[in-house]
C-alpha cells in the first residue's frame, strides 16, 4: 500500500513526471544522434554540461532544456530533409517546456501540448488521405508481405515467416536486375485476401486517427479521448515498433490526462519504448 501511495502521489504531478520522461527520451535520442555533426555538438555539450554542474543553482535559466534544444536545432539545420518526423515534434515539445520554465503557467503549457498533438495527428490523417499509394492499400499490402508490419506476430508462425523471407529475397533479386528489363515479381500473400484486408485496415487507420484528433481538439482531458488515444498508440506499436514517435505521443497524453490509471499506462508505454530504443529493437 505504501508503494501504491507513492505512485499515486507521483502521478498527480503529471507535468513534472512528463518532463522527466521527456528528458529520458531526449537523452536517448541525443545519444543516438551524437555522432552526427559532432564538431558542432561537442562545444554545445561541453558548455551545457559545465554550466549545469557548476551554476545550475545560481542560474535561473533551464540549462538542460536549452542544451537539448540547441542540439536538436543543429540536427535540424544540417539534415532538415532527412530527420525523422518526430524530430520536429520533439523540438516543439522541448520549446514548450523551455518557455514554461519562464512563465510557469501550466494552462499555457497544456494548451501548447494539446495543439501540438492535434496538429501531429491531424497532419498524419491528411498525409494519408493525399497518398494514393496508402489509400489504395498498396502500402500495407507491400509492407505486410515484406514483414515490415506485424513482424512480431509473424515470427510465431514459421510458414508465414518463410513467405516473408521468400518475398524479401524476390525483392532483393529484382533490385539486382537491370531496370531497363522492366521485369516484375508477384508476392505470395502472408494472409488470404490480404489486398481486401489492407484496404479495410487503411480506412480503420484513417478513421481512428481522425476521431482521436477531433477528440483531442474539443475534449483534451476526457477519459474517452485518452482511451482512444492510448488504444491508437498501442495499436501502432503492435503494427510496428515506432517507439520514438509513440513515446512522444504518450508523453503528450500524460500532460493532458487526469485519470491515474491511464497516466500509469502512458508512463509504462514511454518506459517500454525507451528500453526498446536503447536495445535497438525499436526506432529512435
What residue ranges belong to the model's regions?
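Alpha-helical membrane-anchoring segments
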Residues: 1-284
Amino acid at each position: 500500500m505504501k508503494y501504491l501511495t507513492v505512485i499515486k502521489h507521483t502521478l498527480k504531478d503529471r507535468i513534472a513526471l512528463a518532463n522527466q520522461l521527456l528528458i529520458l527520451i531526449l537523452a536517448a535520442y541525443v545519444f543516438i544522434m551524437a555522432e552526427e555533426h559532432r564538431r558542432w555538438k561537442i562545444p554545445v555539450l561541453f558548455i551545457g554540461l559545465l554550466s549545469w554542474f557548476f551554476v545550475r543553482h545560481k542560474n535561473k535559466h533551464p540549462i538542460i532544456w536549452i542544451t537539448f534544444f540547441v542540439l536538436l536545432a543543429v540536427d535540424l539545420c544540417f539534415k532538415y530533409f532527412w530527420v525523422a518526423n518526430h524530430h520536429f515534434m520533439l523540438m516543439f515539445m522541448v520549446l514548450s517546456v523551455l518557455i514554461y520554465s519562464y512563465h510557469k503557467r501550466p494552462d499555457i503549457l497544456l494548451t501548447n501540448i494539446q495543439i501540438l498533438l492535434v496538429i501531429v495527428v491531424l497532419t498524419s490523417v491528411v498525409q494519408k488521405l493525399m497518398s494514393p499509394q496508402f489509400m489504395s492499400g498498396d502500402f500495407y499490402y507491400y509492407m505486410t508481405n515484406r514483414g515490415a508490419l506485424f513482424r512480431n506476430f509473424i515470427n510465431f508462425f514459421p510458414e508465414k515467416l518463410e513467405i516473408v523471407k521468400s518475398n524479401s529475397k524476390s525483392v532483393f533479386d529484382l533490385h539486382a536486375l537491370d531496370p531497363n528489363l522492366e521485369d516484375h515479381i508477384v508476392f505470395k500473400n502472408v494472409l488470404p485476401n490480404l489486398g481486401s484486408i489492407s484496404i479495410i485496415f487503411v480506412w480503420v487507420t484513417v478513421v481512428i486517427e481522425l476521431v482521436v484528433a477531433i477528440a483531442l481538439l474539443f475534449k483534451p482531458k476526457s477519459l474517452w479521448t485518452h482511451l482512444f488515444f492510448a488504444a491508437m498508440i498501442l495499436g501502432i506499436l503492435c503494427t510496428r515498433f515506432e517507439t520514438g514517435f509513440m513515446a512522444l505521443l504518450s508523453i503528450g497524453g500524460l500532460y493532458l490526462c487526469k485519470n491515474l490509471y491511464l497516466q500509469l499506462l502512458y508512463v509504462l508505454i514511454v518506459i517500454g519504448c525507451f528500453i526498446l530504443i536503447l536495445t535497438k529493437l525499436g526506432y529512435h
